[in-house]
Amino acid sequence: MTLKVGVLMGGRSSEREVSLKTGEAVYNALKVKNYLAVKIDVGLDVVERIKEERIDLAFIALHGRYGEDGTIQGLLEMLDIPYTGSGVLASALAMDKAATKKIIQYEGLPTPPFMLVEKKEALKESLQACSERICREMGLPLVVKAPTQGSTIGMSFVHKEEDMAGALELAYDYDPVALVEQFIRGTEVTASILGNEEPVALPLIEIVSATGVYDYKAKYTAGMSDHIIPPRIPEKQQNAIKKLAVSTFKSLGCRGLARVDFIVDKQGNPFILEVNTIPGMTATSLFPDAARAAGIEFPDLIEKLVELAMENCGIRRR
């Protein structure tokens, strides 16, 4: 029997356009592999659409809120439909950069020093006074992030104290808490992880942005960033990063796939920045490049993710 796979894409988050590109690429790959595939643009009628299509498995190609945060995973659990990627808890934890940082810190894994600043507390203190205090306590430069956003949405780099208030306001447009992190200069490296109970790290990628910052434009515009495989760091450091990435994957309880982003400082020390449980699968995305470097072409990668989802389903239902 041919497996019918529903590609869940689009959605309602700020990353809708990226999700549509990922979904289209996944859909085409499934067709190449002779799966019976159907595209489902996730909206308020998603339950009706899923039931109507009578899918055997959901391939989650959603990014951001409602797709990566455990929401759609919980819905699929209730509908008893197998799905690709991490479960409810791991998805929710990885989507919240603040929660991820706390777990990484608890596990004793390296991550840049950080501070969580609640909007209500910042406004009570006054945004200006809060900004001055943050810069005084943490020093400059800093990175301010909206914890639950992806694709660098709501993120700012702060090099001057007078820019901190605006950075906080931007983060608060998306979340009630801002994650303020020490900005570490160095080499950006990402580790793509594939597997369930025995995950493996694919070849590492060094990211070099044309603008110096791997922002939304650099991520999704052809020619705006270079993916260097292998990274221009010693093999010993590469192996250490791979081990850290797998440890992070396991600590959060991820499965199927994830991408762990690092910064390597000038002394060669790696720091974990964040975890992405549904990495982009567009023409400019990192995960497919890492798979290709490991000898896995895109259609084969997509089929492998379907197989991992079915394997996990079997594990859960023993």
UniProtKB/Swiss-Prot annotation:
Residues that bind Mg(2+) 2: E274, N276
Q: Which organism is it from?
A: Pelotomaculum thermopropionicum (strain DSM 13744 / JCM 10971 / SI)
What pathway does the UniProt record associate with this protein?
Cell wall biogenesis; peptidoglycan biosynthesis
| Binding residue positions for Mg(2+) 1 | D261, E274
Into which family does the record put it?
Belongs to the D-alanine--D-alanine ligase family.
Question: What GO CC annotations are associated with the protein?
Answer: cytoplasm
Where is ATP annotated to bind?
135-190
Q: What does this protein do?
A: Cell wall formation.
Q: Which NCBIfam families match?
A: D_ala_D_alaTIGR, PRK01372.1, PRK01966.1-4
Superkingdom, taxonomy of origin: Bacteria
User: What is this protein identified as?
Assistant: D-alanine--D-alanine ligase
User: PANTHER family this protein is in?
Assistant: D-ALANINE--D-ALANINE LIGASE, D-ALANINE--D-ALANINE LIGASE B
Q: Which UniProt keywords apply?
A: ATP-binding, Cell shape, Cell wall biogenesis/degradation, Cytoplasm, Ligase, Magnesium, Manganese, Metal-binding, Nucleotide-binding, Peptidoglycan synthesis
State any single GO MF term.
ATP binding
GO BP of this protein: cell wall organization; peptidoglycan biosynthetic process; regulation of cell shape
Q: Where is the protein localized?
A: Cytoplasm
Catalyses which reaction(s)? 2 D-alanine + ATP = D-alanyl-D-alanine + ADP + phosphate + H(+)
Q: What is its main location?
A: cytoplasm
Q: Which residues form the ATP-grasp domain?
A: 101-307
